[in-house]
A protein has these predicted regions:
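C-terminal structural segment of proteins
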Residues: 1-205
């Protein structure tokens, strides 16, 4: 799996390499990570930013659910009794698409996240377009960040202001400290990762 993802989305592959030890990675599955629904699950922000869809099966019936609509709360999801995740559908990369992701943790490997952020976008006329941004560690479940996406959409990378991102973070998430990091740290990192993700596009724009 890492090899397939490496070619298309190197940042996602890096997140996967930092997920647990090799024995864990060789037996674990993405579907299991998703179904477990940890608020700090590492694969989900990447998959959400890439527009992943889940195929759910119960008996001979299947249905498709966007991953960013899968969770209803902490460790809660839309799976019905007897239903399981049969497949994860991921769109192929398109020309001009930018995907960035980064996990922040105390240790580089084999550690749970303070937060993990992932973003997908393209540049059209020098402005950010089709922005999808997702996090873990900021809410009861991994999630998209539509208020932050709105701040970014249609803006030139150089025009994005830290203060606007801070306001969107405050409006999107309930402040709470955790064992791995304070809210002040998480919210600062959440903002700075976005700025880092678009920084390299300023010269292009």
């Amino acid at each position: 799996l890492e090899g397939l993802i490496q070619e298309a989305y190197p940042d996602f592959a890096e997140v996967l390499r930092r997920f647990g030890s090799p024995p864990i990675r060789s037996t674990a599955t993405l579907a299991g990570n998703i179904a477990n629904g940890s608020p700090i699950g590492d694969s989900m922000p990447c998959l959400m930013a890439l527009g992943a869809t889940l195929v759910l099966r119960r008996g001979d019936k299947t249905r498709s659910v966007a991953l960013d609509q899968f969770y209803t709360g902490q460790k809660q999801n839309v799976l019905q009794a007897g239903e399981f995740i049969e497949a994860i559908e991921l769109p192929k990369p398109v020309a001009g698409q930018v995907f960035r992701a980064h996990k922040v943790s105390k240790r580089f490997e084999q550690d749970i996240s303070a937060t993990c952020a992932a973003i997908s976008y393209s540049l059209k006329g020098g402005k950010l377009s089709g922005v999808k941004l997702a996090y873990n560690g900021l809410a009861p479940a991994p999630c998209r960040a539509p208020k932050l996406e709105a701040v970014l959409e249609g803006q030139a990378p150089a025009d994005v202001k830290a203060a606007d991102l801070d306001a969107a973070i405050a409006a999107s998430f309930t402040a709470r400290d955790g064992l791995r990091a304070t809210w002040a740290y998480r919210s600062l990192v959440a903002r700075n990762l976005v700025l880092e993700f678009i920084e390299e596009q300023k010269e292009v724009a």
